[in-house]
Amino acid sequence: THPSYTLYTSGTTGKPKGVQRDTGGYTVALAASMKHIFDAQAGQTYFATSDIGWVVGHSYIIYGPLIAGMTTIMYEGLPTRPDAGVWWSIVEKYKVTHMFSAPTAVRVLKKQDPSWLKKYDVSSLKALWLAGEPLDEPTAQWISDALAVPIIDNYWQTETGWPILTLANGVEQQTTRFGSPGKAMYGYAVKIVDESTGEELTGPNQKGVVGIEGPLPPGCMQTVWRDDARFVNTYWKSIPGRLLYSTFDWGIRDA
């Protein structure tokens, strides 16, 4: 339970919230996610295009791949500098097997000359994971056609440290439609609830707040740094009528 780090959320309103993460639980969560979500094997190569200032950088540039015995690539720069083939040249040069990026970056690449993708051998790549914002279907379809590998959306937060919703292909081969981040990972009891009443919305296509029943699984935040009361009041008491962790994000159950 000893704190491993404090990472401030990217919210733009109010006093910044320092997410305090533990050490043991976080290590367990990352080890499990590398095996069960990413189907990672020692000796493979992981390339997350994030920055270590973000949670993806902590979890899947620094700690996760190294825990799994993988080589991890740390790259600083834009996906279009010096040219729009720079990421794919890295994939070719280092035989990247697992790649993690964001929909915005893919949308930027989509606007570039498509021939850049054909200049490099990306056959080592097993899948591309995307997170950080909603992944629209046209973008997912474009990069799927371009790379000819599974494109796997996943949803989570700075606060959770590892994916809430995704596919656990290290357990069994799963599929989902483009535009959906998949299903809840083990440990996350995800609910869609009415923002005003706290009532659970169980039908398809009903929009509500994404909540999680406690206790949260290993790897999630312990508290807000030096402000336990704010942790409870902000995250656990914002949904009326029930003690439920609020992600403050909207979600729709599609089935």
Where is each model-derived feature located?
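Conserved ATP-binding/catalytic segment of the ANL
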Residues: G211-A255
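Hydrophobic beta-strand positions
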Residues: T9, I192-V193, I252
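Conserved pre-ATP/AMP-binding loop-to-beta segment of ANL
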Residues: T1-Y8, K15, G25, L30, ...
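Conserved adenylate-forming
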Residues: A42-G43, A68, G77-Q206, E213-G219, ...
